[in-house]
Amino acid sequence: MASLSNLSDSITSTLANLPPQDQIQDGERMRLLGLVEQLQTALEPPFVPLQRFCVSHYGIVMIRIAQGMGVFDAFVQSQSADLSLKELSSKVKGEEKLLKRVMHFLCAYKVFTQPTSEVYKPAPLAMMLGGMPGDMVKHIHNIMQISAKLFEYFENNGYKNPEDAFEAPFQFAYNTKQHYFGWLQTQPEAQSAFNSVMTFSQQLRGKNWFEIYPVAEKLNSSSDRVLLVDIGGGVGHDVIAFKKRFPDMVGELVVQDLPQVIESIDGALPDGIIAIGHNMFEPQPIRGAKAYYLRTVLHDWPDKQALDVLARIREVMAEDSVLLINEHTAPESLEVPVIPVTLDIQMMEVFSSLERTEEEWVSLLERAQFKVAKVWKVDTVGTLVSLFEATL
């Protein structure tokens, strides 16, 4: 028992001397968090994680309710460091009695602190939730409607793995025949939240693919040939960044996405970049480009539809064309982190898709009759990202 007492003293001392968050290197942060998780697992009796499983969904639900009441907006707009219950109640929707219960919950989860009774001070997380990251909660709250029906879905289908993007748990839960992306177009708030999550994810993704791929060596082309086609490229973030990094490379850059996405592009694109409305399941209009590029597109589709997309690309590639797929890769180790496996379940319930391992990505490309030339590792924190280079 003396050793546990010493451990407790050591942890207390370490906490008292931790450097500020912005002075901790990401690699060291992840290593320490991993050790904290191991320590927690070693100390907890089985009933404690069971309790946590049983109540974990309430965090998202209560934050979503607080968003609806306007709690986070009130703190962002307030000039005061903290607000009393009375002050906060005057700035939000709903009854004060309910507000007090919501705030009591959020304080327990360290979203807010209570300097004194019925006075609330936002923790850093609360201020984040008043901005773009708060849309992540709105997005996940929509996904939770599917999760709530997941058991019923598998009871009905005999516990078969979903394999078709149009027969996913999403369609079952929302009683629709639409694909998730089609449904989003009819739900402005959900679409806005999804877009924010995608933008926020881009900010966290680490190095761009062209920082680790030998672009000058591999993608030299002629001026009368399209240099790169970014399929499913949204409003052009990747091709714009590529153009800034390689302003003198010859050949046009093309960003493709559904017409309504292309129409949402704000302002003119830089010279040398053109935008084309295109459904990637239909014949590819750009033939013989030097490179065809997809970033986090195919992970939204099960093999059935992913193979169709790859077939449309393969049939227009020239002998020296290159296919570049920039994707998350699921870890293959026995000790898998929680976030990647959770994302895998999200892909399953929304799209009938999956987070593929490197081996599964290679297998998919080979079944589509591509040769994998090399797998390039992209430097990121907390996730595995790879660039798959494939040829005919």
Give residue ranges: language-model regions.
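C-terminal alpha-helical "lid/dimerization" subdomain adjacent to the S-adenosyl-L-methionine
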Residues: H328-A368, A373
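NAD(P)H-dependent oxidoreductase Rossmann-fold/reductase module
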Residues: G288, P340-L343, L392
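N-terminal accessory segments
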Residues: M1-F181, D224, Q369, T383-L384, ...
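Residue-level "edge-of-site" marker
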Residues: V119, S353, V378
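Short acidic-aromatic active-site loops that bind/stabilize oxyanions
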Residues: V61, M198-Q203, V350-L354
